[in-house]
Amino acid sequence: MEVNLDLHCDLTAYLLQPYSSPNGDVRCSVDKLFAGNVKMQVMAFYSATEKGSVDEVKEQLKHYRSLLNLPGVYEFYPEKAELQEGLGIIAAVENASGLCEEDQPVEDAFKNLDWLISQAKIMYVGLTHHLENRFGGGNFTQAGLKDDGKRLIDFLD
């Protein structure tokens, strides 16, 4: 049987919806991931560039942590590069606006990222999504990398 590694899943954002369930009627449900023989799943913490984006990522982290309590779900560590039985999950920040809102000091992004890393294994941090933010331009913009984006990249390095 083939093994599938999936690098993007919106389950934690979906779980922000009222009455949602990790095994609900959604194509990214844990049940469907198991049925598709997904052995490693990146759980993208997405928030739009707007007020409340940092709190939204913190809520998604809570859902991520609760997924780890489900039978057969474990946190994946790429440095071990070893898949176990079940579903390995690892978090990612899909839009750095989830680390720091537009009107907050950029140092808040560093503090929030450090805190996230203390709570979950993070696969990657995306600076933008579709639109422009303080870190750079998304795929629907002409803006490039901005000074705060350079600072975040330096911090990640």
Question: Where in the sequence are the language-model features?
Answer:
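N-terminal hydrophobic targeting/anchoring segments and the immediately downstream early-domain regions
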Residues: 1-147, 151
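Substrate-binding cleft of carbohydrate-active enzyme catalytic domains
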Residues: 152-157
